[in-house]
């Protein structure tokens, strides 16, 4: 059976988690049968839960899956002020709130999985609250060595830009005549050049709203996406060193955001972990190798079961 054609068999439910300052919107699969393994997936900066539908939907036979729209993304309504954004601890705290609700609903610790920024947030949440987390599956998480991070912080402190990713995001066009035009503009180009068209369509579907004038507008404001790239005041090294849960990691051969020494540091935290560089993959590994990512999540769950965790 063709993987890309078989993954749409289950339509996710759209849910809301109310918090004091707004709601976290998330998608949910596999919730109709008790006993499935609880799994939360956190997306990359600028994306949304629906982007990963073709990775996550096939897991619904064995997993109870929740995938959020992070603060400032998708249908989530939590405050997202680019001018006051300094680090990713806000995502850690939001993810802890999601994990607490998921654990309460299922009565079980959950697996946290995430891509890029979502992987980093999952590491920080697991380090802070191992009582909620059974393990981690990381897909090219953003882990920047301290020297490079300090340069970013100094640039931010003195009002300098000097961050090509942030500068590019800030210039991103936010409004198109319709979603179809947006898909045509993105497909096969720029950051989307290695994505199957179906992933671009899902990204646009989950990441836009239709305005009163009929035009399609990005739900993740370019200014917020840019602020995320610049907001490097969190200490991911400290979180890695405080990890006390098992994990697995896939990272890219080309343009990986998981820079040395982090693959080695992570391996020290869990000597049994599978830390695998995927040949031919870029940072957009989930879009390029969706079945591989889904299979890694299944294999990690099997490892936990075999070890009685």
Label each PLM-derived region with a short phrase.
Residues 19, 66, 70-113, 295:
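Active-site loop/oxyanion-hole signature of alpha/beta-hydrolase fold enzymes
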Residues 281-290, 294:
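Catalytic histidine-centered segment of alpha/beta-hydrolase-like enzymes
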Residues 207-268, 277:
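Conserved serine/cysteine hydrolase catalytic core
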Residues 108-151:
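Conserved hydrolase catalytic core segment
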Residues 170-230:
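Conserved alpha/beta-hydrolase catalytic His-Asp/Glu region
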Residues 25-80:
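Conserved HGGG/HGGXW glycine-rich cap/lid loop of the alpha/beta-hydrolase fold
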Residues 40-44, 115, 251:
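The conserved beta1-alpha1 loop
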Residues 139-175:
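A catalytic-pocket lid/entrance helix-loop region that shapes and gates access to the active site
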């Amino acid at each position: 059976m063709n993987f890309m054609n078989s993954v749409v068999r289950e339509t996710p439910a759209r849910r809301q988690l109310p918090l004091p300052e707004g709601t976290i919107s998330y998608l949910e699969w596999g919730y109709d049968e008790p006993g499935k393994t609880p799994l939360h997936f956190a997306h990359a900066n600028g994306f949304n839960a629906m982007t990963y539908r073709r990775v996550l939907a096939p897991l619904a036979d064995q997993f109870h899956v929740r995938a959020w729209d992070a603060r400032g993304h998708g249908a989530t309504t939590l405050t997202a002020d680019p001018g006051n954004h300094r680090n990713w601890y806000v995502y850690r705290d939001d993810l802890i709130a999601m994990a607490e609700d998921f654990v309460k609903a299922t009565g079980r610790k959950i697996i946290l999985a995430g891509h890029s920024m979502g992987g980093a947030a999952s590491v920080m949440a697991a380090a802070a609250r191992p009582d909620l987390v059974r393990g981690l599956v990381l897909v090219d998480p953003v882990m920047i060595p301290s020297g490079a991070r300090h340069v970013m912080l100094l640039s931010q402190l003195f009002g300098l830009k000097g961050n090509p990713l942030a500068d590019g995001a800030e210039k991103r066009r936010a409004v198109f005549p319709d979603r179809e035009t947006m898909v045509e503009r993105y497909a096969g180009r720029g950051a989307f050049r290695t994505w199957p068209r179906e992933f671009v369509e899902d990204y646009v579907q989950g990441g836009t709203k239709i305005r009163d004038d009929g035009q399609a507008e990005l739900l993740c404001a370019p200014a917020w996406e840019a602020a995320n790239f610049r907001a490097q005041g969190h200490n991911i090294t400290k979180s890695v060193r405080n990890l006390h849960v098992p994990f697995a990691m896939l990272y890219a051969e080309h343009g990986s955001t998981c820079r040395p020494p982090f693959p080695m540091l992570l391996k020290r935290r869990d000597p049994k972990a599978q830390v695998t560089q995927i040949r031919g993959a870029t940072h957009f590994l989930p879009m390029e190798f969706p079945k591989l990512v889904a299979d890694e999540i299944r294999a990690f769950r099997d490892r936990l079961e075999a070890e009685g965790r």
